[in-house]
């Protein structure tokens, strides 16, 4: 079972929240106090919630379900892409396109266009075009790859979302909520936990903290896949219901 410990979180600065004047009262029960006008997150509450989320992800992966990693702000994008690739999970690291979940039919068509352009780039088609047309297609390919490259192999809707900054990725969370897709999210002291099924109260800005979240989640996916034993997609719905109770 994938687990993190208190020392890991302290070293990563998970306990440092935002300035006290920016706090969200809905996160009050996860705040230990304040130091130099910075809220300090109660890691004794974060620890079991983080590990519960890791267990959920591991069991999902064990059932061959897909977890979509989402982190599009500058401090998160590179780490999200690297760790998602390490565990073979889909990811969004550049910009969340509206309708990425709720209008997946259109997104699927864009992914097909991306794949077609990739084939053309490799089979010499671009070389046969005029310079202007080749440049236009190359730019189109780069744009599509930046937006959709992380989900081109997803194959369908994900079974869960893992989100680094719930404020920054609110559109993604809203879409997941509409479709009944469970959401795991890192929630800082300035954010609202609404719409998040598995809350991880913690610093969503520090690079080391983001590395801890993403590395731990990727490890959970890998561990789950290495222990495949009859999990099912229905498990996600069961866990969501249990979390709501």
Swiss-Prot record:
Annotated InterPro entries: Ribosomal_uS2, Ribosomal_uS2_bac/mit/plastid, Ribosomal_uS2_CS, Ribosomal_uS2_flav_dom_sf
Annotated organism of origin: Pseudomonas fluorescens (strain Pf0-1)
The keyword Ribonucleoprotein is assigned to this record: yes
A single BP term in Gene Ontology: translation
Keyword Ribonucleoprotein: yes
Keywords: Ribonucleoprotein, Ribosomal protein
Family to which this protein belongs: Belongs to the universal ribosomal protein uS2 family.
Pfam families referenced in this protein's UniProt entry, alphabetically: Ribosomal_S2
GO CC annotations on file: cytosolic small ribosomal subunit
NCBIfam families (alphabetical): rpsB_bact (TIGR01011)
HAMAP family registered for this protein in UniProt: Ribosomal_uS2_B
Disulfide bonds listed in the record: none
Record protein name field: Small ribosomal subunit protein uS2
GO MF term (any one): structural constituent of ribosome
